[in-house]
Design a protein with these regions (language model features):
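GHKL-type ATPase core
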Residues: 1-58, 62-68
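Short acidic (Asp/Glu) and glycine-rich catalytic loops that position anionic groups and cofactors
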Residues: 21-27, 75, 169-177
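Short linear motifs in intrinsically disordered
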Residues: 44-59, 80-84, 116-128
Length: 227
């Protein structure tokens, strides 16, 4: 049965309240620390999956606001696009069955090029090595994150590499998108393009940023030994 509750956000002219009860495998009764950890993970997940809606960028609508227990969810853009130290490629437009697919890659700044806070903000749950890879957006909602689609393994030397892929809702079957909109696999022609892009551009530039900084540190250390 449905239960209608008064919205305690009296200043909101309109909105939607989502009430989750009896969540499978989530035991909020254990202790406060466990509950806070679960809520933090939910906040991070929603902030990442819906970050474009929360940012309100390039959308033909006002930006979305999500509250968890009264606290507003902040967008978790994984690409650090505002940093001058981030390497950003041009946007590639691919035609597939009369549908446009947009691809852009980013090499995030080395740890020594940003503040500790900024480094942590874009690390993501599990760290940089885990969160490298492609991020697929379907109509601006993130449906797949941090995967190279089997094209290459996740290595420390490419931990700063991320790519965003935008697709519409008219090629779901081609991308093998499931009913939950939580998995996707690129068609062969698109994967061939991604393979060439990842191997010849993304991997090479990502390794270059990491290796260059490592070499600089080695040289600095050698110089100091001679002082």
């Amino acid at each position: 049965s449905w239960i209608v509750l008064d919205n305690n956000k009296a200043n909101l002219a309109r909105g939607t309240r989502v009430i989750w009860e009896k969540i499978d495998r989530a035991d909020f009764k254990l202790n406060k620390i466990n509950t806070n950890s679960i809520l933090k993970n939910i906040d991070m997940h929603l902030g990442l999956v819906f970050h474009r809606f929360l940012e309100g960028i390039n959308l033909k609508r006002e930006k979305l606001k999500i509250f968890i227990n009264g606290s507003e969810v902040e967008p978790k853009n994984p690409f650090n696009e505002e940093s001058n130290a981030t390497i950003k490629s041009a946007i590639s437009t691919l035609k597939y069955n009369n549908s446009d697919i947009f691809v852009q890659y980013f090499i995030l700044p080395h740890e020594d090029m940003v503040s500790i806070e900024e480094w942590k903000n874009f690390e993501g749950e599990g760290g940089y090595i885990k969160n490298q890879g492609c991020y697929v957006y379907r109509c601006n909602r993130l449906i797949v994150s941090s995967t190279w689609f089997g094209i290459m393994p996740k290595l420390a030397s490419t931990k700063l590499c991320r790519a965003k892929i935008d697709i519409g809702n008219d090629i779901d079957s081609d991308w093998k998108i499931d009913i939950k909109k939580s998995t996707a696999s690129p068609p062969k022609s698109i994967k061939n393009f991604l393979t060439e892009l990842i191997i010849n551009n993304i991997e090479r530039k990502g390794r270059g940023v990491v290796n260059k900084r490592t070499q600089e540190l080695i040289q600095d250390k050698d110089l100091k030994l001679w002082v």
